[in-house]
Amino acid sequence: MSEDSRRVEDDDRGPGAAYQAFLMMEDLLDKLKLLSYEDEVLRKQNMKPLSRHYFALPTNPGEQFYMFCTLAAWLISKAGHHFDQPQEYDDPNATISNILSELRSFGYSVDFPPSRLKAGYGEQVCYVLDCFAEEVLKHIHFSWKRPTYPTEEQDEENVIEDDAELTLNKIEDEIAEEDSDNDQEHFIDLNALSAQTQKLNTKESSKPEEILESNTDAAEWILEVERVLPQLKVTIRTDNKDWRVHVDQMHQHRDGIDTSLKETKGYLDKLHNEVAKALEKVSSREKYINNQLEQLVQEYRSVQAQLSEAKERYQQASGGVTERTRILAEITEELEKVKQEMEEKGSSMTDGAPLVKIKQALTKLKHEIVQMDIRTGVVEHTLLQSTLKEKSNMTRDMHALNIPESSIGAY
């Protein structure tokens, strides 16, 4: 889905959008070289230098993303903002968010999703780094200078020009003027011209039809031109863009390469022979050492096997020890619980507070029993008195009813 959307965006922007990343990457690399990124970043981080299309094409996403974060942090710090150097195990989403926030703080707009930067390549990556590089150049007050073109050295013969010398352009102008003057001075005889053309036609018709070839020798022609040039006082300026000059330079360079190749080939052959001899010596020495150490190697292998067996037995024993250690820990925990319970019960038994409370309760009970006995005695005494009183009243009443009859008669 992302590839389709990217293709739609490229179609909307035009056919050159696919190559925009390459142009931005080349500009970015030039700016990084101006900022000496090779000395300040690559050597400190022990990294390889960037190619012309490093961030424009996908190669290794992890390496490209780490390089992008490293360069972005370095450029932000160089532009005057504090930014910590990202590490390999940092969260990439958090790192990208911090980089985009710094980009917004410089006043640039971010109209693309952060996932484009997570890939480590593309136009957006080049755009972000290019913006940071521009801010660094502004921060250090860098100004672009006008290009200086190399001056072409002219021959001494061409520098000193005489007023009488003519250029080819002047000669052509003069010839054209003379032709025009002749045309104006002399009238043209049409009849004579027609007669001459008829004669020429008859002559040409009489000749056999064949290809006309020039019999002029090129070398003689060049010699004649060189001989006549001083007399004509014509100055021919050499053009550095002439293909003949380039061909001569190519031949010169080729001759130089051939001569250098002959010398270098001898040195390379000698070096090849020395390297081959050294390799033969190394291989023979290696075989000798292997033969000498064969017995020790066998002993080492046997000892290695014994060591592996001992390690296996140790692992088995350590497994049993671990199990027993776990059981011992459980038993120790249970023992601690029992000890704690015994201590709690012992402390409760040796404590005198409950006994004092019991004694106080017994004393209180005895006091209450004494009070109850007293009350019981009082009640019994009261009851006895009331009983005796009733008996006395009853006896008195009985005596009152049994009055003797004699006493009644006397009355």
UniProtKB/Swiss-Prot annotation:
It comes from Xenopus tropicalis. InterPro entries: Intra-flagellar_transport_57. Disulfide bonds: none annotated. It is found in: Cytoplasm, Cytoskeleton, Cilium basal body. One of its GO terms (cellular component) is cytoplasm. Residues 317-408 are annotated as: pDED. This is Intraflagellar transport protein 57 homolog. The keyword Coiled coil applies. Pfam families: IFT57. It comes from the Eukaryota. Residues 161-185, 261-351 form a coiled coil.
